[in-house]
């Protein structure tokens, strides 16, 4: 185990267009092989599609989608004796945000056909309407936590 203590978290700079840290984190999640300008094109293109289709501010729609995707509870394995129990725990705010963004991008990538811009826009709009793969993932996570409620006293 490392002996140097905790590494300090680096602050994410807000993106230049929407001046939002959440959008900046989305861009970083979409990015592959360090191609940030391409990731920015994809995200801003997706936001333009959202503005076109909904007639609302894309940042608002994105925030709504994130709120519908971010999990409140998750299960973590805890070994007690010879058995491993899935113990439900609350998710810390930073992890909630990163999981929400990760799931949005992951399920956007899994969508068939079309460009990544369109897939990301569709996933964000679906999540804002409480449908789509990323919302289903959150619900499944919550179901797992609910099913393992009996082991909640094994928290650490």
From Swiss-Prot:
One Pfam family of this chain: Ribosomal_S7
GO molecular function terms attached to this record: rRNA binding; structural constituent of ribosome; tRNA binding
SUPFAM superfamilies attached to this UniProt entry: Ribosomal protein S7
Entry keyword set: Ribonucleoprotein, Ribosomal protein, RNA-binding, rRNA-binding, tRNA-binding
GO annotation, cellular component aspect: small ribosomal subunit
Superkingdom of this protein's organism: Bacteria
InterPro entries on file: Ribosomal_uS7, Ribosomal_uS7_bac/org-type, Ribosomal_uS7_dom, Ribosomal_uS7_dom_sf
Example GO BP: translation
Function: One of the primary rRNA binding proteins, it binds directly to 16S rRNA where it nucleates assembly of the head domain of the 30S subunit. Is located at the subunit interface close to the decoding center, probably blocks exit of the E-site tRNA.
Similarity comment text for this entry: Belongs to the universal ribosomal protein uS7 family.
Subunit relationships: Part of the 30S ribosomal subunit. Contacts proteins S9 and S11.
Name used for this protein in its record: Small ribosomal subunit protein uS7
């Amino acid at each position: 185990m490392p002996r140097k203590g905790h590494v300090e978290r680096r602050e994410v700079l807000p993106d230049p267009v929407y001046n939002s840290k959440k959008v900046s984190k989305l861009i970083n999640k979409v990015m592959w092989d360090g191609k940030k300008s391409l990731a920015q094109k994809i995200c801003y293109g997706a936001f333009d599609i959202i503005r076109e289709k909904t007639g609302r501010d894309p940042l608002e729609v994105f925030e709504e989608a994130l709120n519908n995707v971010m999990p409140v509870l998750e299960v973590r394995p805890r070994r007690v004796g010879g058995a491993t129990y899935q113990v439900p725990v609350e998710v810390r705010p930073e992890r909630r945000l990163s999981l929400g963004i990760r799931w949005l991008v992951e399920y956007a990538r899994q969508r068939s056909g079309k460009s990544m811009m369109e897939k990301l826009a569709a996933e964000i709009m679906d999540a804002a309407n409480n449908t789509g793969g990323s919302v289903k993932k959150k619900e499944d996570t919550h179901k797992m936590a609910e099913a393992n409620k009996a082991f909640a006293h094994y928290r650490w």
